[in-house]
């Protein structure tokens, strides 16, 4: 019995040493990625794909004394563009002649960003170095992020060895299969970026403009709201809450985001006017994105996120309405 116990303790000690070694190896790369995401000038083309759909996007990223700016141009013929200036994001949709303006969240960008500190992330993910590879002809360090439960996806990252810029990511499902991919096919690092390269080619004057509310709700405000979520997956906390006006929608939509520091889920609550045939009931998915919808007290609740179906269902079925005094 003592021998067995000694073997278990010895094995646990080795596992702990390996875990500590992995953490020590990954942390510098996360810090390097964080710096690269906000300190480099570059221009390139990346592909973003899920299922059989593949989109090609041109990106121009600039950092100067005026701040951080970015321009994304869709190469699929729609002419859609996304302009980022600090935390202000302008999305241009030529096909619907509309423009959406809102404030961005830290992770809502390309290339995808990841937390710089492992911290609480370790409670829900295992992080380790996973060898070397090349992307767009550039040497990279691979990092594997594995979930500790079935309520979130894993990630495989390819980080540029010289600059720390994230050049490729795979989002991995419960069977460790890629369900979404982001990858640079061409990248050029620049000394500076001309101002006109960050301006859209589209004349937006005759477009309809929609602007998100500029007064996000705090967690305390949510506690006073008529809506609350009784059960969240472990580690998930409110990241954002605000009212949106969505194109082709008359009534404003309440939008909340919950995150574990890596995965995020959006909850949309809107008045159900019984006129929309687009409302989702039950579960649905498109590639890595899962969704769950239901009606409640004359409202329609939709939960969407790049997480397993079980996660959006858990959150969707936990949304409740309460009468306030």
PLM regions and their residue ranges:
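Short, surface-exposed coil-to-beta transition loops
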Residues: 54-58, 151-155, 167, 179-180, ...
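An acidic-aromatic
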Residues: 56, 60-112, 171-183, 189-191
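N-terminal leader/targeting segments and the immediate start of mature chains
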Residues: 2-68, 76-77, 104, 120-122, ...
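Hydrophobic/aromatic beta-strand elements that line small-molecule binding cavities or substrate pockets
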Residues: 57-63, 131, 155-159, 184-185, ...
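Intrinsically disordered, low-complexity linker/loop segments enriched in Gly/Pro
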Residues: 106-155
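Gly/Pro-enriched, hydrophobic low-complexity segments
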Residues: 136-205
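Short, solvent-exposed recognition patches
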Residues: 208-296, 310
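Short, hydrophobic/aromatic-rich segments at coil-to-beta transitions
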Residues: 39-43, 65-71, 137-144, 165-168, ...
């Amino acid at each position: 019995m003592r021998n067995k116990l000694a073997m278990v303790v010895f094995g646990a000690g080795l596992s702990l040493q390996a875990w500590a070694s992995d953490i020590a190896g990954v942390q510098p790369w996360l810090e390097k990625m964080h710096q690269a995401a906000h300190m480099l000038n570059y221009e390139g083309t990346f592909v973003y794909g899920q299922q059989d759909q593949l989109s090609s996007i041109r990106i121009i990223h600039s950092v100067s004394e005026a701040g951080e700016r970015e321009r994304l141009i869709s190469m699929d013929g729609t002419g859609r563009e996304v302009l980022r200036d600090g935390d202000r994001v302008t999305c241009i949709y030529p096909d619907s002649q509309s423009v959406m303006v809102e404030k961005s969240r830290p992770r809502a960008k390309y290339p995808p960003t990841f937390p710089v500190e492992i911290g609480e992330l370790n409670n829900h993910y295992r992080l380790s170095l996973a060898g070397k590879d090349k992307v767009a002809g550039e040497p990279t360090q691979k990092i594997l992020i594995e979930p500790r439960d079935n309520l979130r996806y894993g990630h495989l990252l390819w980080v540029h060895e010289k600059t720390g810029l994230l050049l490729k990511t795979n989002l991995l499902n419960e069977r460790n299969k890629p369900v979404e991919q982001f990858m640079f096919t061409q990248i050029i690092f620049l000394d500076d970026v001309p101002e006109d390269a960050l301006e859209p080619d589209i004349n937006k004057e005759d477009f309809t403009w929609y602007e998100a509310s500029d007064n996000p709700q705090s967690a305390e405000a949510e506690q006073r709201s008529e809506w609350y979520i009784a059960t969240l997956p472990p580690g998930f906390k409110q990241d954002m809450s605000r009212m949106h006006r969505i194109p082709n929608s008359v009534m404003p939509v309440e939008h909340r985001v919950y995150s574990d520091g890596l995965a995020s889920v959006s909850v949309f609550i809107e008045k159900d006017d019984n006129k929309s045939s687009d409302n989702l009931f039950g579960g649905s998915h498109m590639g890595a994105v899962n969704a769950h919808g239901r009606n409640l007290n004359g409202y329609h609740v939709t939960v969407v996120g790049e997480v397993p179906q079980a996660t959006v269902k858990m959150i969707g079925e936990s949304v409740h309405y309460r009468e306030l005094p």
